[in-house]
Amino acid sequence: MLVFAVIFFVFALPSLFGRDVEIYVEDRDLEIPLEGALIRSWDGTEYECDEDGKVFISVPDDRQVVVQGAYPGYENGRLAISLGRDHFTLALHLSGIMENRELVIEASRPGVSESRSGRSVAISGPELARTAEIGIIEDVMTSIKLLPGVGYSGMFNAMPSIRGGDPGDLEAVLDGFYLARPYHWGGGVSIFDPKMISSAQLSHGVFSTRYGHTISGLLEITSKKADPTEMELDVGLSTSAASINLSYPLFGKGGIMFMGKVTYWDLLVWTAQGISKAAPGNETLDLINAVSTAPYIRSAALSANYRFTTDLELTLNGFFGSDGVGASYNTSYDEDGLLGGEVAGDDGISGSVAMDFDYHNYQGFGIAGLTFNPMPTMALRATAGVGYTELIAEGLVNNDVIVSYNQKFLDIYDNPFVSIFNPLIPPVYAPILPPTGTYHAPDLNAGINSDNLVFNAQARFDMDWDLGKGFLVALGVQELYTNWKQYEDVGLFMESYMQPGFVNNKYDLLAIYGTPFLTAVIWPFHKIVDVNNHGLFSSAYTLMEYTTPNQFFGTEVGIRMDHLYFSGKGFSVPADPIWSPRANFDFNILKNKDLFGISNFLESFSFTAGTGLFSSMNENISFIEEGNDGLESLKLNRSWTTVIGTKLDFAGGFSFNIEGYYKQVFNRAHIMADITFDSADSVNVKWGFDGEGRIWGFDLQLQKLASRYIDGWISYTFTNAKYYEPSNSEFGFGGIGGGEEEDNDWYYPSFHRFHNFNLVLNIKPVKQFSIALRFGFASGQPTTKTTYGEVYPYPVQQADWDETLQKYVPRLDENGNQVIIQKFRRDAIGREETRGPWSLPLDLKFSFFIFDKKGKVQTEIYLGAENLLSLVYKPQETGTTFNEYTGKEDTGSNSASFDLPIPMVSFGFKWSY
């Protein structure tokens, strides 16, 4: 009720503190309206003029204020808003002199972000900053995750599901350049700092054939350009980050911008570690104590633009970033076998387990773009660039543990021994157990050293040609080369269950051991992965747009071709060309018309419908090795999407949009279940390219455009998504990494949520103070609740690989006896498919502003808090973890609601000039 009371109160604020005035912006000489002109209000808020050059803004009703107007190619203007009037005109004139040139009002160039029903939703300017700059991490993806059609993914997950698609299907593009893995912390946050971005557009419908390489969602990022006439400086410092942004003009024809930022979590980790020690028992917080290197991010970006003439512009963008984290964890068990507070001797374990892990990620890219207008009706753009990302991970787990055989195990392990796995095997004598009644557990000595490098080089050429009379044609070609390098040195112990008649002499334990009852064996596995694969994507597209003179009807139809040539060490796979036709149809039923006398209430009403095909490559395919089964049938992921929607624009800056969609996924790549081990260091992975998906749903958004006192939006998304892998049907489950299963092998994926709701508000009661609020709820993700039978021990024989015999042989102890360890198991007797708890994120930010008299310097002091409801909301437990070495359940819950059970608080200031 408190939230709704606040909403009601702030909606009443305009009537208490101000008034709305209309500003009309025109060309001084031609006296024509300037659509898209920006009005910067007295408090720094920006407003955009409509197609008639008009905009409504809120101003104080007790004094005169001054606003600024800006439009590309025109000199900035100032306008005094005096008392007693409600309508004002601001006339701007062209900057400089253009001889023998005609004035042309151009449409937005390709790549400019805009919200279009059935295609995309865009966020830019102040609303982007307000939603992305609330928490301890300022990230554009924080804003994207609040848009309709986006599934909740948690506080530290920048890879959401877009309209039921796999999170990995989302493709990011910066100024036309495809980015490989634009994330820090393994996908926890993105590299897109709001200070370097002017707008972000999420295309989750039937978007233009200009772009491909995705079957679910395209994120188009437009970089920020430096002001060509004024220097700008922004400095920020908070409890978790320090940043600087400098923009410098270049002779009035462009500018250069630098951004540097360091994110440090030392204070946050130190605080969490203190809380965990003061309130022990929370397993999630206890893990914080293992952090040896606090999570960090270091990034720098450089952008420049220069307009040589009115028809020729050069843009440059560069980025470099690094991030990492380190952990060191040590668990000790006392001589009595104390483990996690159990009764002394209950587990019979003494010793220690140590774990060390270090993760570092590096990435960078450089992009150059040239835009040329050879004639007023044609725009040409060439883009080229290179990029790379490298992930280095090192981990090691060691243990020095002595375990006592418990009595239940000794009762089972008796001579003569009858196999509990196969009663038909005659009784035999088992290997002798040590007289001490204990054994030295095998040192896991599990380690991984990984170096994963992705390099890409790409170029594209695009042309837009306005043919007149509402017709526009566009075409383009693109080349994208990618080199995937992966080196991994993995060592660990694996357990196998072998039965008589197992057809692989390397694992024929009956022949090796002569003890047929020992059907379980733990053996060392060592694997070196050395992959060097190449992929060349060649693409071409063409499209045509048409709009009737009265803008009642518009359409965009096009077709795209993508071809992949994939090769690696000893193999090459030329895939067939993929054709992707797409079409959109728009009907502006009410625009600039008085239909049924309601134009004063409903300003526009439009309807849209679209359908099209899309394709992408599963990233996991990039690390396929020679000999992997299924490689010869490599296919690209495909989807067919159909969208219908309607949008209504109301008086007062309100808009409502609702869209429904159906998406059919096919040729989806997946790893099949029959993974086999050919030798001690050889793994054969079988791939399938027959995965399917059926996704349908709808989303809606009610938005209040930027205004003086309150703005924001409410969005709701419903998604029903099921997947199916026919190749895995014979194994009796939906697929590896799947979620909630269905009887017919169609299953809900692990990332699926039926319901997602977001409320975003920006409240500005006075010029010097604002409140930013983000609240949402999301239904739970699929999970399985399993009922188990009795826990019982079983013997496991430890094995080593014999290089001479090329077989696994028994490991012997110091007395020459075969090493036998005890493990525990429990059989599932029932399964219930259910859902995890609902997520209820609530974030708040309080900002205080200080302005100088000239309005050029602004200081912001803010206090932000994320995950506030974690103080009062306790998610239900959804399961425990069974310890195979102790036979007990480790307590704890699997929460899908919060990343940490405490609010994340940040405090800082920002200074801008």
Where are these regions (language model features)?
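Periplasmic N-terminal accessory/gating domains of Gram-negative outer-membrane beta-barrel systems
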Residues: 75, 82, 87-88, 104-111, ...
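Transmembrane beta-barrel wall of Gram-negative outer-membrane proteins
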Residues: 240-264, 277-330, 358-382, 386, ...
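Gram-negative outer-membrane beta-barrel transporters
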Residues: 547-553, 662-664, 685-788
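A short, solvent-exposed loop/turn motif at the edges and junctions
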Residues: 42, 64, 68-80, 110
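Surface-exposed extracellular loop regions of Gram-negative outer-membrane beta-barrel proteins
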Residues: 587-642, 662-686, 774-788, 873-876
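C-terminal beta-signal and adjacent terminal beta-strands/loops
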Residues: 768, 776-805, 809-820, 841, ...
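Short, acidic Ser/Thr/Gly-rich low-complexity loop/linker segments typical of extracellular
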Residues: 44-55
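Face-selective signature of the C-terminal outer-membrane beta-barrel domain
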Residues: 307-322, 357-570, 657, 709, ...
